[in-house]
Amino acid sequence: MQQGDTIFSNPDVRTILLTETNDTTLKKEGFQITTVGNLTKVSGRDGSGVIYGCRELIDRVSSSKGKLNLPEKLTDGPEMVLRGACVGLQKMTYLPGHGVYEYPYTPESFPWFYDKEQWIKYLDMLVANRMNSLYL
């Protein structure tokens, strides 16, 4: 922790501080997690970095099996600028009178495309896997 950070003295209370930083050693969308005592600080190079740092903590809590061991210092950041998935919106046949694969994206032709709950789960999965783009 840097000088000036508040260190909380109650050992029964863990505090997580989220912050954006101007640390140019972090990659774009990168983050650093530092733990001193009961204070854990998640610093992101930008807002996405803070979110990815939080996802790292969520992953560690989920896999801790009752014994939480937060890193004293962990720095991470993406190697690729664009990371994402491609969802193909096409059918296997042409529409009558058309010589190319073109379709209106209507609930009748692509009902799954309009399923809000499914999209929320899918987008959550993209964030959990540190993806930042979706190609349709």
Predicted regions and their residues:
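Short, well-ordered secondary-structure micro-motifs within conserved domains or adaptor modules
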Residues: M1-E29
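Feature activates predominantly on carbohydrate-active enzymes
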Residues: T24-G30, T35-L136
